[in-house]
Curated annotation (Swiss-Prot):
The gene is dtcC. The modification 4-aspartylphosphate is found at residue 55. CDD domains: REC. This is Detocs response regulatory AB hydrolase DtcC. The AB hydrolase domain is probably activated upon phosphorylation by DtcA. Its EC number is 3.-.-.-. Has an N-terminal response-regulator domain, a central AB hydrolase domain and a C-terminal membrane domain. Its main location: membrane. It is an enzyme of class 3 (hydrolase). Probably phosphorylated by DtcA.
Amino acid sequence: MIRILIIEDDENKRTDIENVLERNGIHKPSYISHDNIQDGLNSLKEIKFDILILDLQLPQRSDSSPKEDGGVSILYKLSAVNFLTPTYIIGLTQYPALLEKYAEKFRSIDFNIFDYYNDDWAHAIKSKIEWIIASQKTHLIRQPDKDIYVLTHGIMTSGKWQDDLESKLKNKKPNIKIIKYTYPYYSAFQILFPFLHRKTIKNYERFVVNLTAQYPNATLNFISHSFGTYLTVNTLSSSDIERNASIGKIILCGSVLKSDYDMASLIEKCQPKLIVNECGIKDLPLVLCNTAVWGLGNAGRNGFYGYSPLLKNRFFDGGHSYFFTKSGFMDEYWLPFIFDDVFIECDGRKKTEANDLVQSLFSLLPHIIIPGCCIILLVLLVLNLF
């Protein structure tokens, strides 16, 4: 998690800085803002910040007048043993005279001052954030306060499996943190139209962002079924979660994602410990999903294409809810993976030429049925008009 401190007494400038951070995926409480020297120093005693964004002209306290060398006085104090020195310091001023006067002081400690009216400071912040994220991915040994497991169900269900899995996990480890994410019951008809579930997707993104804020030092693990896999993977792919949280194990089962989904980019972005994709080779709902629903697929039946050592497809001789209805499945496959990092291979597919032909025909259906329906609708519309 990146920690940034802003010490800036001008409200408009402070808002501009915060907006730059937000655009670069840094959200509260990853950054803290103060408008005076004293509050800033108090935070510097308690927290090791990655970046300090420092105005030059600052008041000692909120109710006092700004001092020309207020920001510079903080620099002098940072060498004391009772302060946690930030990794990077970015000076900022709207006064050219102060920029010229104190530029050498900042350069002497290998940092820079920027003119507020020049966009260079925003680019500098963006570059520092990207550098810190890259450094953390490469060198950070993750030692989170705790593991959190997020369980997300699919459509047309109340998610009973979430309760069953929670019970098994807590029997093994009573203090494990489990969060069962729920959303309104969706019918198969509702899932046909993307605009009907946009709010659910947005709510899930907000939930995960808030989770990273509430547990900034935890590792997030996800176990998702059916449409829940769509929520999980798209949130991790499209948001900036990895800037504020560590991602651990991900189990996807009965996934409605497309088999050619760009999982490689997700893995590169989030650096999960391992993604396991559980497939039911008799999952008929996914055949319909892949055929009739725009934007969805049957990765929970055919697996994800491509290769990554951090992505494993497992194939079972079962249907859409096989992973919950098959007696002992969770105990045999999930608990060893969750608690002991033991991944058990399984491939229940019948690799025959006839089966390959059937799979090829299934894969062609979306390219025939969806365009065909569109053509029929267009013809009906034309006939109705003329």
